[in-house]
Amino acid sequence: MMERAEDLRLSLSLSSPLIAPRTHHVAMLFHAPPEKRFLEMPLLPAAKRSEVVAAEEERAGLRGGGGSDEEDGGCGIDGSRKKLRLSKDQSAVLEDSFREHPTLNPRQKATLAQQLGLRPRQVEVWFQNRRARTKLKQTEVDCEFLKRCCETLTEENRRLQKEVQELRALKLVSPHLYMNMSPPTTLTMCPSCERVSNTNNNSSAAAAADRRGIRTTTAAGGGSVVDTAADGGILCHRPIAVRPQQS
């Protein structure tokens, strides 16, 4: 009994150095990043892997005349995405269908898959990728447009800042110029003030005419104004507006 226990302890002590590195390696893989964990994982032999992938492709019906490669919905044994190999005719039919209907309902999806000899899931993944590429292209176009708008606004902002700096410098150099400047205003007079202003203007004109030897007379009834010189000659007739007298 004692000899059997000694043999058991001896076998455990001999096997522990072989087990410990394996356990440590598994623990390191568990805490390693996913990409390193994938590289460190033991893989199947190359011949076995090729046989499995070929069988999987034949089962899914992915082999065909190469027109374009699209990602399939599933993943391979090694974690990489499988490529959906489409012929030129299949790609053309899918493109035409996408132009007509960017999103398919289940019935359209099943009909198109049956027409192309694909699975509905493969058609769905192709349409998802196609919509993603279209959205990416539109995003690039919008980004370029917004970039140009930003450059234009930046240039306009720079120009306005330069004008502001020039105006500030001019204000510092000659401040009295801005103090003497009066804002433009529009003068509005009431009718009574306007009559007074017209009377003053007429008085000034009559005084100037007297100084030049011109006498202004009003015809009977207030019809027109006659300007005569000092020697009695008539210079001109100036019609005036007749206002009816208010009783």
Swiss-Prot record:
It comes from Oryza sativa subsp. japonica. The keyword Ribosomal protein does not apply. It is found in: Nucleus. The gene is HOX17. GO terms for cellular component: nucleus. This is Homeobox-leucine zipper protein HOX17. GO terms for molecular function: DNA-binding transcription factor activity, RNA polymerase II-specific; sequence-specific DNA binding. Residues 79-138 bind DNA. Residues 58-81 are annotated as: Disordered.
